[in-house]
């Protein structure tokens, strides 16, 4: 198998602090670039954990269609601005940020007070504009998660009349593109290719770390396949026939035969099916007359037992 390497050939940071990394992976055997590209892209776009704003509480507001006196943006605009925040929380539990501001003021992401475990990537992101003589109080909930989580209208949090839920996008990777160069990558090499990947993140993680995390997830996914365990199927025991479940009392045996069998711990037809004719004769006080009586009773219900232990 070819030993390939991955090189980051470009890295850019945009004004909104989003990051773009371009990687070149190769040399690869023909077909491997598509396998790697599709697998990495799927994990990068939907499998990485990230942070997102999941709810906002605005003082004096109890629904998203309201307006706030002295604030240029309406509630829906403020919720959208909060949803678009690039944020990174190292706390697996809920984090709550707070803002108390007075106008005139343009509120930006950096004005929200979080604990030291929360980093706001783009601190210049505008949130709201407050006019002179007016105030704005916000409470912003931040959680960690994977993928996309819609608002659950039946959750306990949504029953709070003043807590405005937001459908959360936890995905730290915004875009992944890849192309395949099918030309030879070394002199004399044929049938080889290279994979070129462009990874764009929201800035809460770097493209390098995103690639590494995606690769580790794929390793964990495929590692168990390296050791295939043979599982021996345990045959199912056949269910006993209805006749075998008939209790001894229903065979209408003589009192002597019945009592001898009960003392031998024979309680049903199923127990009798483990005996041969010779076995019956070995039961204490059980003679050939009683044994013949049992044989006849079993034959009446369509069951026969062997004459001897060695009979087939």
From Swiss-Prot:
Taxonomic lineage from the root: Bacteria, Bacillati, Cyanobacteriota, Cyanophyceae, Synechococcales
Domain notes: The N-terminal domain is essential for RNAP assembly and basal transcription, whereas the C-terminal domain is involved in interaction with transcriptional regulators and with upstream promoter elements.
Catalysed reaction, written as an equation: RNA(n) + a ribonucleoside 5'-triphosphate = RNA(n+1) + diphosphate
Gene Ontology CC entries for this record: cytoplasm; DNA-directed RNA polymerase complex
UniProt keywords, alphabetically: DNA-directed RNA polymerase, Nucleotidyltransferase, Transcription, Transferase
Superkingdom per UniProt: Bacteria
GO molecular function list: DNA binding; DNA-directed RNA polymerase activity; protein dimerization activity
NCBIfam families, alphabetized: PRK05182.2-2, PRK05182.2-5, rpoA
GO biological process terms, semicolon-separated: DNA-templated transcription
Region feature Alpha C-terminal domain (alpha-CTD), mapped onto this chain: 240-312
Subunit architecture: In cyanobacteria the RNAP catalytic core is composed of 2 alpha, 1 beta, 1 beta', 1 gamma and 1 omega subunit. When a sigma factor is associated with the core the holoenzyme is formed, which can initiate transcription.
Function recorded in the entry: DNA-dependent RNA polymerase catalyzes the transcription of DNA into RNA using the four ribonucleoside triphosphates as substrates.
Alpha N-terminal domain (alpha-NTD): region residues: 1-229
Gene3D superfamilies in the record: 5' to 3' exonuclease, C-terminal subdomain, DNA-directed RNA polymerase, insert domain, RNA polymerase, RBP11-like subunit
HAMAP family: RNApol_bact_RpoA
Similarity comment: family membership: Belongs to the RNA polymerase alpha chain family.
Name of the protein: DNA-directed RNA polymerase subunit alpha
EC number(s) recorded for this UniProt protein: 2.7.7.6
């Amino acid at each position: 198998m070819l030993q390939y390497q991955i090189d980051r050939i470009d890295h850019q940071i945009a004004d909104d602090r989003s990051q773009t990394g371009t990687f070149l992976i190769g040399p690869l055997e023909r077909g491997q670039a598509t396998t790697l590209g599709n697998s990495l892209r799927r994990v990068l776009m939907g499998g990485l954990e990230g942070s997102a704003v999941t709810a906002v509480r605005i003082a004096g507001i109890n629904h998203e269609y309201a307006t706030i006196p002295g604030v240029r943006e309406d509630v829906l605009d403020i919720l959208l601005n909060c949803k678009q925040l690039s944020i990174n929380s190292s706390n697996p539990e809920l984090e709550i940020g707070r803002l108390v501001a007075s106008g005139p003021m343009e509120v930006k992401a950096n004005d929200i007070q979080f604990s030291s475990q929360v980093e706001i990537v783009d601190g210049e992101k505008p949130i709201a504009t407050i006019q002179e003589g007016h105030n704005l109080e916000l409470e912003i909930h931040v959680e960690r998660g994977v993928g996309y989580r819609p608002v659950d209208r039946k959750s306990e949090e949504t029953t709070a009349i003043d807590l405005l839920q937001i459908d959360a996008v936890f995905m730290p990777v915004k875009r992944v593109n890849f192309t395949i160069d099918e030309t030879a990558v070394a002199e004399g090499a044929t049938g080889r290719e290279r994979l070129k990947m462009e990874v764009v993140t929201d800035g809460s993680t770097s493209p390098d770390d995103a690639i590494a995390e995606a690769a580790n997830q794929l390793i964990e996914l495929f590692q168990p396949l390296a050791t295939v365990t043979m599982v021996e199927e345990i045959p199912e025991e056949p269910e006993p026939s209805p006749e075998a479940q008939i209790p001894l009392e229903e065979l209408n045996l003589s009192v002597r035969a019945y009592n001898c069998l009960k003392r031998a711990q024979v309680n049903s037809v199923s127990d009798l099916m483990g005996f041969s004719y010779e076995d019956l004769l070995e039961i204490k006080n059980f003679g050939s007359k009683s044994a013949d009586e049992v044989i006849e009773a079993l034959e009446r219900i369509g069951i026969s037992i062997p004459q001897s232990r060695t009979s087939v």
